[in-house]
Amino acid sequence: MQINRLLATLLAAILLSPIQPIATAQHPPCCGPISPAGARLASFLDNMDVESLWLANQHINWETGKPDRGAGYEGPGNHTHCSAFAAAAAMRLGVYLLRPPQHGQELLSNAQGEWIAGPEGQKAGWRPVSDMHRAQHLANEGHLVVVLFPNPDPHSPGHVAIVRPSEKSAHALEADGPEVIQAGQHNHNKICVRIGFENHPGAFPSGVRYYTHPLQ
């Protein structure tokens, strides 16, 4: 009798629970499948170990992300390192993104935003991307894609992240933007643009800009 009551309770719970959508059938990828080149890019980004390196509140070597000053250092360049991480990742992929020594680490993301949109960025092979759907698609195809928010206040830092391959749905893309990897106040191997840029009012969705560079 007790077993019957337990079974009845379990059955009622199952019947009353919401039916979860089948991801592949009802929510197909927004931006195409991840190509072999996209899979290689994703593996490369995973191996950057961003959640252990380029950490905030310490001075770091921009190329390696490792601390290069003592624990008590309180001078300039010890805050966040989104732009150093983006430049280091691009360099390892054989792509130039404005970096030291051409520009110091302080306010580098703002300078990268100005540089990449200008003639020097175009000469280096960077091209603007029309929208976030195209940005995610290009990343899935294995292209290097960055998303930038130069701060309207030139004395305050902006933000930059790298779009990583993802098979997120169109609904998730519209709500949260592309999937990115970033350093910042908190480093994330995988996070959406909406949350990754939330400390910058006016950034997502209309304030950010996307740029791409082909990879060999």
Where is each model-derived feature located?
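Sec/Tat signal peptide C-region and signal peptidase I cleavage site
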Residues: 20-25
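...with weaker cross-activation on analogous glycine-rich loops/strands in unrelated enzymes
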Residues: 102-188
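Low-complexity, Gly/Ser/Thr/Pro-rich intrinsically disordered linker/tail segments
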Residues: 176-216
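N-terminal capping segments
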Residues: 26-107
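Generic hydrophobic, helix-prone segments enriched in Leu/Val/Ile
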Residues: 37-53, 57-60, 64, 70-71, ...
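Bacterial N-terminal signal peptides
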Residues: 8-18
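Bacterial N-terminal signal peptides that target proteins for export
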Residues: 1-9
